[in-house]
Amino acid sequence: MSVRTPLRVVATHDFCCAYPPSPTSYGSLPGGEGLKRALVALREQGPIVRADAGDFAAPGALSTLSGGKAGFAAAADLGIDVGVVGNHEFEWGIEHLRAHAPETGFPLLCANAPDVGLPPTSLVDTDRGVVGFVGLTCPDPEVYVFAPRLDPDLGEVAIGHAEELRVSGAQWVVALVHDGVDWHFGREGYEAHPERFSEVCRPWAYAVDAIFASHTLGRWIGRVEGTPVVQPWPFGAELGVIELELGEEPRTYCVTPETGGRWGGAGGELLAEASSRVLGELAEPMSSRSGGPAPLADYFARALREATGVQAAAVDMLASQPPVDGVLSYLPAGPVSEADVLRLYPWPDATVAGEVEGEELRRVAHAPWPWPWSVWGFDAVDRSGAGIATLAVLEGDAAKHVERTLGRRVEWRRTGVGLREAVGRVLS
């Protein structure tokens, strides 16, 4: 007698256009093809609903190369049935999001920002029953480049839509939330701190059967008010799984896809071209760790300093791999391509320069970046701090970080040199 397999909801989050199987400090990301193969294997075992908890279309090399367009089209090849908008889907503006959301081929949800005009919920019918999804984008307006108007009462939004889904026939309701647990990487390794996120979910968690978390690049499997929560590793490194069976408590766990090959879906030619453009070689591997040290980010800072001809430079570098071992970004020894540099820094890369006093420069050099998923790279001709120095940084968050550290405004001026151009010069 065959065993009836439960319905599984399988989700990724913060995939960030990680379509190439990029190297990491611990091995490799699976890439888009690896994810597709993992889903085929799961479907052979029984019915699944494929979900995504946001930031699938940006950031990443493919997103930057295509002006924010190809990340939406490529997602159509990942077998996703339903997803929620992450803050980075807003990176090119609300109108851009509205225009390209249909290219994904799946319902892209956004219940707590109704002005965006995307559906708040979706029903997925399977031969095991009907699953209702409510999508909640990140409730923190500070994380957006172009923030939508966010409903301040997340509880009312989630509870109301969960009730509507059940009235419409949903036997289970799953919340896709673009927010997640805080974390720290210390002497004991990776430590999740779910307290803040639990407070976000506590008023409404009872109204849903399960929650997929995301956004913070961390990992956690736990419960809020008895409701199971799964936040797998980001970048497709893991698939979060919630097993649903009528009359049974949901079961939660994660699975690890194997590494796939070159991406053959939408945007594959753009990625192949960028991968074929070799900028130079590294004699030794380089990486940056959460909390430091960050020699890879320091290397980017050195490239910016040399390209702009200033005395010092600083670079903020976000994670491009899960912090499984504390490493946030990694380049192996050997050839470095344009795609590699874009993977490490896919953001707008205009740089600015301004004057700081010697003591101020020392403070900037040792100013910790406020989030564990980013590092602060620094390089200077002379760190002794004698006299006034010109400091180059990335426009935006890095410039603001310097001003917060110094407690004053800096008279910034554009350098005319992009960070990726600077890195290309030092590599060549």
Where does each model-flagged region fall?
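Catalytic centers of hydrolytic enzymes
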Residues: T12, C17-L29, E142-A147, D153, ...
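Acidic, metal/ion-coordinating pockets
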Residues: M1-G260, P295-A303, T351
